[in-house]
């Protein structure tokens, strides 16, 4: 594997210099393959180290991996290369997710600059989240097309994301701010929706859960550190510097993936191999299975696959619908806290903007503690069970992880709401956020694993629908959060009754994983989509 050669930078250098990355050994292998196919007209046989490509009924020579140890297969890359790609995805996810919360410390200044109320400015947060809810329905499926791959989607969409921060920082009206924020969320979405697929490209199933956890920490770290970084910019300069800083962070991520992010999509790598074979031999029959399958898709079929099916699954499947609502609530609480924390810690404890940003670190600490415990659970329980079953296990088994987590969310909300008063030390409500982080982390890990195992054939559609559902819910919460807390009070505990309302809703959700654990198999057996 030529690591740098397979990056966007390497491909550009190759294109400009007109150098072919084919070598004499590969050419020799291709010609030997062709001679064997022509002489034997056989398929799936081997001679020495050379695999004869299968010839289908239409005369296409199907290009696959040479064998299980093919070095171009991302699963066979060296450890250092996999770790570099994992870092790329985690940092890219952080760089986009930080864009949601980095916005919040400057809301008051933006109100003064634009002469508008709170809700119109908060729409900048709402539309950003809504943008990365809709984006995956359009951009993520493009990464599954063999001719496109994942790498170029990451680079091009992030380039647009970086450029959009310039008019956002320079604008002085909602007419500029709101469309730019929506577009930024839209073009930042591939990292959030496709990052997990990239990790699945390079890590074996028994190692993937560990590295998915690191990716989750990157996703949590963005919103958690955003208020601190944005607050520092507001204090040091102005609200405009929130977006200049976001441009710098995402610009650095763009440089990293431009130089150090190779293509990981199996379909695209094999497509490029088939393309090289066609170029070397002049034989246009060299094709990949994915290439042939995608060539038969019409625009209507593609729309059904990417837009309609995720919505149908989200509404018609009881398992998917119930988990989407639950995950949506948990996800929305995080964005609601972007309004609740300033109300509590600024009005009651008189924190500065910087100090208020530090409050969110409690969530990150809770996530890191849970991560360490979850790793032990994976190593001692989950992975051995997976290996012992040969990968054939009931999906409901993973829901056990969520059982304690279902109680953590309401505990956190009641604790946070009623401890947030001047007579109670400020550290007490912050400690409650550790329970939220732990509950959210475990719930997301178990429920996403359950959805993936229950709908293996339609996992992309299920995850796209979940992303749309939870992000749409989260986008709406900041719009009514301040009014809810201000109107419910009481004045000595301003977030108490608002948190209590959410805590009661969270209590109503507690039975969901238990019900699915007991009756999930029956529900799946009645579904035409589930395994």
UniProtKB/Swiss-Prot annotation:
Gene3D superfamilies associated with the record: MFS general substrate transporter like domains
Family classification: Belongs to the major facilitator superfamily. CAR1 family.
Species of origin: Schizosaccharomyces pombe (strain 972 / ATCC 24843) (Fission yeast)
GO CC annotations on file: Golgi apparatus; plasma membrane
GO biological process, one term: xenobiotic detoxification by transmembrane export across the plasma membrane
Keywords assigned: Membrane, Transmembrane, Transmembrane helix, Transport
Record-level Gene Ontology MF annotations: fluconazole transmembrane transporter activity; spermine transmembrane transporter activity
Localisation: Membrane
PROSITE patterns given in the database record: MFS
InterPro entries according to UniProt: MFS, MFS_dom, MFS_trans_sf
PANTHER family in UniProt: FLUCONAZOLE RESISTANCE PROTEIN 1, MAJOR FACILITATOR SUPERFAMILY
Protein name per its UniProtKB record: Caffeine resistance protein 5
Membrane topology: Multi-pass membrane protein
Parts of the chain that traverse the membrane: 83-103, 119-139, 158-178, 182-202, 214-234, 241-261, 325-345, 358-378, 398-418, 424-444, 495-515
